[in-house]
Amino acid sequence: MGLRAGSRCRADHLAQPQPQGHLAPVLRCGECWRARGLPGGCCLHTEGGCSLGAQAGWRTAGWEARGRRDLGLETTSAHSRSLLHLSSWRRPDVGEAAGAELLQRAPLQQPDPAQAAVEGGLLARLPRPQDQGCGQHRPHSPRLVDIALPGGGWT
């Protein structure tokens, strides 16, 4: 008993990635607290991404790297949402649409309780001890975090 053509087309359509939700403004490194009107400027960069931004509900678009070292961090947060930090996204040669067609979305899943200790909507502690040197809530200047992005071909 085969599928009708209409059903097959609908199944193919549903198999394609669908856009979900609205994108928050792209945050530059160190902007999470300031963007939420909070004191300080520490992003708590960890292997899990910008935890403060994730816990505050920020969702940002993934940008395409393609060998460009002027792009920052694209990774998965404690809540498995894609976050992006661009320390130089306002530069004339970068532009806000410099790869906006590539949206990196991590699948939604239940956060690890150990990584989701929340106080006032923000992560109360680092999800992992290996941060980028900014320590516990100490403000740091914006800087680049180089990691390989899908399709980037660089390390």
UniProtKB/Swiss-Prot annotation:
Domain of life per record: Eukaryota
Disordered, as annotated region: 130-155
Name under which the protein is recorded: Protein FAM201A
Species of origin: Homo sapiens (Human)
